[in-house]
Amino acid sequence: MNIFVLDKDPMRAAMMMCDKHIPKMIIESAQMLSTVHRMLDGTPVKRRSKSGKTIQTYYTFGDIRDDLYYLAVHKYHPCTTWTAESLQNYNWHYYHFVSMAKEFKFRRGKEHITFKKLGPIIAAPPINIKDIGLTEFVQAMTHYPECMVPGDAVQAYRNYYHKAKPFAKWEWGREAPTWWKGYSGAEVHSETA
């Protein structure tokens, strides 16, 4: 679960993502955006898990939306929390989701099923979301603290790609971003490229 903020512009960030991340992150973004809708506009209901072993909190709308949105997952993940924090954060994340779906269509020649199902539904932000402006992007990479750059999520996520994503390839019609080219696998940068 993450939002790869490889650029401050959500479309450019999507264009810079490696081939493997495009289909995967469309699903993760849809999960986070759906979760934000459920948590902010839904009603919490406690009931047994599917296994029956635990009591869990579910969020219901009490209408057709219960069948449309994904179930709430990773409610307290930093990226989900960031998305729920403000209208502008939600909108940035939604436009990134749309941009990833466009990238998928560009690179693979077909529409991603998750976007087909949820794209129009999650376009409207939650009713109960705060309008406080775009907040600082979260850096969800605590397992790679050497990649983090205080106040610069873009550089941090580029560092993270370099350090943790050596598998990254751009073979489906998009060239690797300039900040990736020439990367040897050893360096992690502290300033924006």
What is the predicted role of each segment?
Residues 1-72, 76, 80-193:
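Sequence termini and other peripheral, non-core segments
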